[in-house]
Amino acid sequence: TEETFTNRHDIFTQNGFSADADDHIKQSVYAAFADYSRSIRHWKLNMGIRYEHQQTDYYEKGIRIDAQSPTYNDIIPVLAASWSHNGKSFSLSYRLRKNNPDYSLLTNSIRYRSKYEYSQGNPLLKTQKTHRFSAGASWNWLYFSAYFSRILNMYTNIIMPYKEDTHPGVLLFATQTIPTTHNYGISFNASPKLGCWEPQLNVNMAFLDMNANKIGITEHRNQPRFYISLDNNFNLPKGWFFNMEGYLSTASQQGFFVTRTEGQINARLSKSFLKETLTITFTANDILRTGYFHFDLYGIDAYMENRIYRDFQRFGLQVSYKFNATKSKYKGTGAGQSEKNRL
């Protein structure tokens, strides 16, 4: 069993910028869970189930708001089966994931981001649930996987004009939920060992079918995005190690987002001394200075285009020395870790 209790009180005084806010959230979660696993020759089976009761009480200026105080009673299952024999393996799984919004999003207060950008939460956000089906297969150094997700009440940021009559040109970033979203993906990985060269090739395809018509955004595009990366490791004579990695992400249009082609190349040369306690590393990041991030965002009567260079280009020398450090003997995470992350 698991119990989590949260009591959060936020007071925002805006000094005339916008209306003040006084939000108080009390939440309690009670859960019980069980799982069963069994091995049958080359097969492994696992089943789990979790029952969760969640009660939220939301107060604005001391008054309980019923519409913002939901109660959930959820059954969350997990099913998995895998087979492995003679270097070959195959797996199938299904799981339901439940995600609650961060508490910082459950507020009506307007926050200042910049002269032309404000942000606002949404106390009416519902719990996001993801039904995920996945399959994977491997043989020696080859691996393939595929997944399909059906996401209910997916959280997303949207943009819209903020009080055009008194704040012309200002965009408001708000959080909304899209009732139903489908997410598909496949991945291929190859990691052979060819003498001193150990390459690792990854090819991924992601497809997001996100229709935002119900929240007022008419743009709806369906185009997959491909991601290709190649990581090369070279174990050279006399203890030298060289690594060169690069990636390429193709342009795509998904839902109301448009992304551009991105790519980057990095390199690293290192050698250890004094029984591997002293390491000297030469680094070169974003060698071709291509670390740009491009995206366009369509909103409600609004459009935003971004082209950002993330200043990744670096050339340097690193020297590190390892001392005898005592490792932590405790590796637990605690039952309330996800709730603390929301805070």
Residue ranges and their predicted role:
Residues 205-210, 225-273, 283-288, 296-297, ...:
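C-terminal beta-barrel architecture of Gram-negative outer-membrane proteins
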Residues 27-65, 72-78, 198-207, 228-251:
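Surface-exposed extracellular loop regions of Gram-negative outer-membrane beta-barrel proteins
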Residues 24-25, 67-70, 98-152, 171-184, ...:
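Outer-membrane beta-barrel signature, preferentially recognizing the C-terminal barrel domain
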Residues 32-38, 79-83, 92, 125, ...:
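Residues on the lipid-exposed face of transmembrane beta-strands in outer-membrane beta-barrel proteins
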